[in-house]
Amino acid sequence: MLKVYYTFGCPNCGGPIDDEHLLAGVPCSKCLPGRVENLDYRVIYDLLVKNSTLKGYAEYFYDNETFEEIVRIFKRVIGNEPWNLQKYWIKRLAKSESFSLSAPTGLGKTTTLLVYSLFFSNTTLYVVPTNSLKDQICERLRNMGAKVSCNDVKEEYINVATFNRILRHYDNYVSLQPKLVIVDDSDMILKSGKTTEVMAKILGISEEIFQYAISLIRLKRILKFNEDDKELKNKIVELEYKIGSWKPFVQFLVASATLRPKGIKQQALRTLIGFEPSTIQTYLRNIADLYYQGVDIEAILDKISDNGGLLLVSKEYGREKMLELKEIIEKRGYSTGLAISGRKFLNKFTEGKIDYLIGSASYYGVAVRGLDEPKRLKYVIFYGIPKIRLNLTDALNNPSLIVKIGELLNIDVKDIRRKLLFLSPPEFQILRYSLMKDEELSGKLKDIKVNLINIKEKIWDVLKSDNIKKLKADTFLVTENNGKYYVYIPDTVTYIQASGRSSRIISNGLTFGISIVLVDNIDLLDILSQKLKKIIPNFMFKNINEVDIRELKSLAVSSREVSTSQKKKINIKTILLIVESPTKAKTIARLFGRPSRREVHGIPVYETIILVNDEILITNIIATKGHITDLTTENIGYYGVEVGNNEFNAYYSPIYKCYNCGKTFTIKSNTCPYCGSVFISSSEKVVSALRKLSTEVDEIYIASDPDQEGEKIAYDVAMLISPYNKNIYRIKYHEITRNGILNAILNKGKINMNLVKSQIVRRIEDRWIGFELSLALKSMFYERNHGSGRVQGPVLSWIVERTKEYKKNYGWILYIKLGDYAIKKFFRIKEEANKFIEKLNIKINLISERKEIQNPLPPFTTDSLLMDAYDKLGIGSQIVMKIAQDLFESGLITYHRTDSTHVSALGISIAKEYLESKNLNDSFSGRSWGNEGTHEAIRPTSSMDTESLIKDIEDNPNKYFIKFTKYHLRIYDLIFRRFIASQMKPAEVTYSKFEIFINGEKLEVELPTKISGGFSIIYPLKTYVVSEKYSTYLTKGSIIPLFTYAEIIKNMKEKEIGRPSTYAKTISALIRHGYVVESKRKALLIATNKGIKAYEFLSSCCSDLISENRTKLLLQKIDKIANGDVNVDYVLEDLHKEITQISGKLVNSLKLDTNV
C-alpha cells in the first residue's frame, strides 16, 4: 500500500505526518494517538492539552476563538451577523494582521473597523481626513460604549484625529505609542516623503530599519540595470534578512486609497508594513451606459425630468463652463451646487436642497472620488467625453507615442519599434526622461534617441505640409485647433469611477444608476467604448434616443427603496487561488482589474475581484513557485521510501534553495551542502503562507498546471492545508485568459488521485534508478557530477553511437548548389574531392510535373514545436520550452506541454476571426483535428498576430510581466502561423521531377517548385528553383550526420520513451552532467569522452535497466496507473525487485573493477 508522509507537515509539532491524518485535519499520531477521524478544532485542542502535546496548534485555536469573540461583539453592537466579506476581514483582524480593506463604500468597512477597535481595548489611533468624519466616527464609537478621545491624546482610549491635527501635534502622537492604527484614507500619508516618515514613526518603525528599507528599494532599482551583478544580489539578500528580522508591534489598517506608493519612502513603508494600500475596486456596477450626440444639456434635462444628478465637465472646458451650465440648469427650475472643494455641498444634496451637483471630470476631484450619496444620486452626466488632453509637443517626448503617430503618418518606424520593444522598463524611462529634459545619453540609448528625434521632425513636417487636421489611433486622437495640435486620450478610469457614483450599496443590494455622456467628439466615444469593453464584461454604450428612459428612471427610483426586488443582490465569496508561477499569479490578477498586493511570510499575494455570473469572488492569488515538496534525501528507508510488508511509505521534505549557488536540496540544513552559504530559502515559507491564507477564505481553488506534475503539486497543497480548510477544489485551464479562468472556476472539481499516484511512482522510479546509477558512476569515476536515469540512458546511447559513427565516417563533404537545391557528396580524402570538382560537369533535365492538393499541417504539439523551432529558427529545445512557458503564463498561447492536436470550437473561431480581418474569408476551413481529450494543441489565445502583439506591448507596457526578446516574437509567430494555417483550405503544390547528371552520374529528384492558394498565404512551404548554374563548397564532415535536438525529440516520441514535459529536460540533463555538448554553430549534439565512458560502463553492467524496451514498458505502466488500469502497489513491488537486483550487479561490477 502506497502512503505519503510529509516530514514537516504536522499542524501541531511540525514533524512527520501521513496524508490520512492531514486529510482528516488532525495532528500526527505522536501528538494525537488513536483512531484517525474528523474532529472539531476545539476537541483537538482539548485532547492535545490532555495529552500534554500542545504546541503550534494553540495559535490556530486562539485565532479561531478570537474570531468568534469579535463576531459576538459585532452581533451585540450592530444587531446582525457580519456579511461574508466582513467575516473575511475579521478573520484577518483576529490574527493581528496589518492590511488594507479593499471594497466600495457600503460593504461595511467602517463598521468592521469600529467593532474591532471596540474589541481591541488598547491604545488606538483612528486617523480620518476631515473633522466632519471625525465627529461621525466619535459619535458611533460612543454609541457602541467605547472609550473615545476626539481631541486629547489618551492612552487606553480610541484616539480619533485628522491627519492635519497629527502633523500639528506630532510629538504627542508619536509618544502615544498606539498598538492599533487605523487610517481611513491612506492618500493622506502617501502624499509626500515627509508625511510617510511621520506615519512610520507613529507605527514604531525605527530610523535604522526605515533606512534599511530605503536602501533595499534603491538597490533593487539598480539591479534592474545590472541583473547579473552577484555582489548586488547578495547585498539585497542581506538587507532582506535584516528587515525580515524586524517584527512590527503595531497593527496597521487602511480603509481606502486611490494612490499607489511611488516615492522611495512610500515604497519603503510598503515594504515594512507588508502590504500595498489598495485602490477602490470597481467590481460592483449596475448601470445603464447611455450617450447623446452633442452637448445640449437642456435636451438631457428634458429627457430626464428629474433631480438627483451629478454633472461632470471635461477638464479642458474649465470652471467657466461649469458656471455657464449652472446658470442654464437653474433657469430650468433646478437648484445646483458646485462640487469643487469641501463637503458642505454633499450635506445640502443629501438633504434635498440641491438638485444637481456640478464638478470636474477629474479622477482625483472631490466630485468623482469623494462623493457617496446612494439614495439621491441616480444620474451621472458627462459634459464631453472624460479625457486627458496633452499638447502634442509634450506628448512627443514619449517614445511609444512617437512610433504610433509616425506609423499613422506612414513614416517608416519598423526598426525603431523593434529596438524600443526590447528595452527594459528602466531603459525606457531613461530614454523618455532624456527626451523630456534634453539630456545626453550614451551607447545604444543615444542612437535610439537620435532616431526618435529624426522621426519627431518628420512627424511635424508631414502634419504641416499635408495640413492634417485629425489622426485617429486605437487608444488616442490627435486634432488640430487654431494651428496647435493636441493629443486626446479617453479617461476610462474616471468614467468607471464617476459613473459608479450612481450605483451604490443599500441593505446588501446594489442600486441601479444611469450614466449619460454628452458627446463632443464621436471618435473619442468610439475609443472610450473599445477601451471599456476590455475592462467591463459585455460593456456597451446605448443611444439615449433608442432606450425607454422612463423605464430606466423607474428602475433607478425603485432600486433605492428599502425593500425592493429591483436591487441587484450582492453575493460575495472569498477564495484563495493557488497557481505555480509568480508571473501567472500577476497575469491572472491583472486580467480582472488592477489588483492590490500584500506579502504573507515574504510571499507576494495579489487580491483581485472575479465576477462569476451573479457571484463576486474576492480572490487572493498566490504562487507556489513549482513543487513545494520532493522525496526526501534524509536517511529514511530506501532513498526516501520505507519498504516492507507490501507497504511503501514515501517521505517528502520541503525544498530548500541556496541564494548563493542556486542549487536545491531536500535535507534539513542551516547551510547549503554545496557551497556552505547561510542564505537559504525553504518552501516551508510557502506552506506557512498557504495555511495562513486558507484560514481566511471560504474556498480554495488549486490551479497548478494541467498535467501529471501539476496534479502532484495540487495534491501536496491540498494535503498540507486540509487541517485549516476543507473546501478545496481543483481547477484546470489550458489558457490564461479571462474566459479560460472563468470556465475553470465554473467547472471546479476534485484532484485526480490516479494521476497523483502515477507521478509518485515516476518520481520514486526516477529516484531509485537515478541514485543507484549515479552512485555507481561516481564510485567508478571518482567524480561528483555524474548521474543517469531510465530515460537519459537510451538517449545517451543514441548520441554515443551516432557520435562514434560520425567519427568513423569522417572525411570531406562537397556541397554542389544547383540554384537553391544542394546535393551532397562524400570523399575520404581532399584530393579526390578536388579532382571531382576540376572535371565537374552538370546537366539537368525536367522530366515531368504534377500538381497535388496538399492539406496544411496540424497545429503544434510539444514535440513538433521543438522540432520546428530548431529546424526553422535554430533555437534549442530548452530555450523554446522557457519561451513557451513565458508565452503561456502571459496568456498568449494555450498550455505548451501537450501531445494533442485537437482544436476547440473557441480555437476555430479565433482563426475564423483573424482570416476575416485579413479579408481571407474564402480561405477558411475549420478543423478540430485530433479527438477531444485532456489537452488542446498549442495555439494562440486570440486573433492577435505578431505585429498586433507588438502594438499591444507598446500600448500596454504594464500588461505583460515578462521581458520580450526577438526569440519570444519568433516563437509566437511560428505558433500563430502554423495554427492559422491549420484552419485554412488546402494549397496547390506543383512537384517537378528532375534528372540530374553530375560527371555522368545520374540522379533523379522530385521537388516542390510552386505553391499557391489556401494555407500557403499564411504558412508557405519551402519550394525550389533548380538551375544548371552551380557553385561548390568543400568542408570537413561526415557522411553520418550528428543528431539535432529535433531528431532526438522525434526519436523519443516515436519510441515512446519520453513525455512532453521531459523532452527538453532529458537533453539538458545529459549536457549538465557533461556527457553531451552542443556544437557552437549548428547546436548539434556530440557525446563527450566522459559520456562515452559512462554509457559503456552502464551498458556493461545494467543494460536492461537503461534499454529502450524496459524504459518504454515502465512508462506504459505509469500511464496505466494514471488511467486507473493498474494497481500502483504491484508496479512498485516489481520496480523495487528489479532495482535491488541491479544494485547487487552494480556492487559486484565495482568490486571487479577495483580488483583489476
From Swiss-Prot:
Modifies the topological state of DNA by introducing positive supercoils in an ATP-dependent process, increasing the linking number in steps of +1. Binds to single-stranded DNA, transiently cleaves and then rejoins the ends, introducing a positive supercoil in the process. The scissile phosphodiester is attacked by the catalytic tyrosine of the enzyme, resulting in the formation of a DNA-(5'-phosphotyrosyl)-enzyme intermediate. Probably involved in rewinding DNA strands in regions of the chromosome that have opened up to allow replication, transcription, DNA repair and/or for DNA protection. Keywords: ATP-binding, Cytoplasm, DNA-binding, Isomerase, Magnesium, Metal-binding, Nucleotide-binding, Repeat, Topoisomerase, Zinc, Zinc-finger. GO terms for cellular component: cytoplasm. The active site is at Y895. Monomer. Residues 574-736 form the Toprim domain. It holds the Pfam family Topoisom_bac. Its EC number is 5.6.2.-. Binds 2 zinc ions per subunit. This enzyme is the only unique feature of hyperthermophilic bacteria/archaea known and seems to be essential for adaptation to life at high temperatures. It may play a role in stabilization of DNA at high temperatures. In the N-terminal section; belongs to the DEAD box helicase family. DDVD subfamily. The lineage of its organism: Archaea, Thermoproteota, Thermoprotei, Sulfolobales, Sulfolobaceae. This is Reverse gyrase 1. Zn(2+) 2 binds at C658, C661, C672, C675. It comes from the Archaea. CDD domains: SF2_C_reverse_gyrase, TOP1Ac. Residues 90-277 form the Helicase ATP-binding domain. ATP binds at Q86, A103, P104, T105, G106, L107, G108, K109, T110. InterPro entries: DEAD/DEAH_box_helicase_dom, Helicase_ATP-bd, P-loop_NTPase, Reverse_gyrase, Topo_IA_2, Topo_IA_cen, Topo_IA_cen_sub1, Topo_IA_cen_sub3. Introduction of positive supercoils requires the cooperation of both domains. The helicase-like domain probably does not directly unwind DNA, but more likely acts by driving ATP-dependent conformational changes within the whole enzyme. A beta hairpin in the 'latch' region of the N-terminal domain plays a regulatory role in the enzyme, repressing topoisomerase activity in the absence of ATP and preventing the enzyme from acting as an ATP-independent relaxing enzyme; it also helps to coordinate nucleotide hydrolysis by the ATPase domain with the supercoiling activity of the topoisomerase domain. A zinc finger (RG C-terminal-type) spans 655-682. Mg(2+) binds at E580, D705. One of its GO terms (molecular function) is DNA topoisomerase type II (double strand cut, ATP-hydrolyzing) activity. Its cofactor is Zn(2+); Mg(2+). GO terms for biological process: DNA topological change. It is found in: Cytoplasm. A zinc finger (RG N-terminal-type) spans 1-38.
